[in-house]
Amino acid sequence: MHVTHLSLADFRSYARVEVPLDPGVTAFVGPNGQGKTNLVEAVGYLATLGSHRVSSDAPLVRMGAERAIIRAQVRQDERRQLVELELNPGKANRARINRSSQVRPRDVLGIVRTVLFAPEDLALIKGDPGERRRFLDELITARSPRMAGVRSDYERVLKQRNTLLKTAALARRHGGRSMDLSTLDVWDQHLARAGAELLAQRLDLIAALQPLADKAYEQLAPGGGPIALEYKPSAPGEAHTRDALYEQLMAALAEARKQEIERGVTLVGPQRDELLLKLGQLPAKGYASHGESWSYALALRLASYDLLRAEGNEPVLVLDDVFAELDTRRRERLAELVAPGEQVLVTAAVDDDVPGVLAGTRYTVSEGTVERV
């Protein structure tokens, strides 16, 4: 699969831009702040319905514009598709496939798939647990786009349940009459049902990712491993099947109910779980050096790419200003590993930041203009 044409309107710094794209390597080169990352950010948005740089859509819309449009022509084997997203901050986003009538934005998931390497990837190792949960859940959705709906359902139920718990906590704190919490039983069931499906997918993903990540780390840092991915659930137990995970979550919710009512928040579930990344016998966070942390983060991304490729539709590889962050050895090794990709999009401030093995199409990006060299 590869993107053959990218069109943006009022996205970030671009009033309008059209960029033809080839298979193989394409590099966007230009000084920082000129808009090169905006291009690959748009491709990534089509794949995840989110940005790797900001948490909301508002910064993605050009100043003074009401909405932004991302449009891409995609080719997979002999099949061609046109996918379009309209970003409307404060309102519902819109989507179209092949200029048809409007579809839900999440219906476009799976048409474009990406694996993104970026300076922010260090947060996978050094950041808080939310960074690692996001990594898992975005990859789960790339493997199975229907999981976007499951994640949305879980977040909706969690929000409703937290509202109920907060109201109960405030009532108790101010000496008010005790609330009828019978509806909490219903929310527990909904939360456990969606949570169990999400947990089952996370556990399956980790099992599939572990050998690939260990292999990738050895390729990047020979003799530096092994590495291990260990899931730490907030609901104690050893369950792996969806039904067993449902029962495990229900038991944990029952056990935590008194404390949850006191604190006014849900204390167990996927939103509280942790992915522990180990280097040797120690947690990478706090123990891995800067170079080891980079190798670990790159290994996770390479493993993601290998997994998606093995399961069918090869993703677009996006390397956003990542080579400037790496020492010479890691830079050369990473370039060798990604060079055979069906489509590889690279951004760099200067030509020298693009390894020679990644020779291909070049664009210069300056002051909002994108020109092929």
From Swiss-Prot:
GO terms for cellular component: cytoplasm. This is DNA replication and repair protein RecF. The RecF protein is involved in DNA metabolism; it is required for DNA replication and normal SOS inducibility. RecF binds preferentially to single-stranded, linear DNA. It also seems to bind ATP. InterPro entries: DNA-binding_RecF, DNA-binding_RecF_CS, P-loop_NTPase, RecF/RecN/SMC_N, RecF_2. It is found in: Cytoplasm. ATP binds at G30, P31, N32, G33, Q34, G35, K36, T37. Belongs to the RecF family. Keywords: ATP-binding, Cytoplasm, DNA damage, DNA repair, DNA replication, DNA-binding, Nucleotide-binding, SOS response. Its main location: cytoplasm. NCBIfam families: recf. GO terms for biological process: DNA replication; DNA synthesis involved in DNA repair; double-strand break repair; SOS response. GO terms for molecular function: ATP binding; single-stranded DNA binding. The keyword Ribonucleoprotein does not apply. PANTHER family: DNA REPLICATION AND REPAIR PROTEIN RECF.
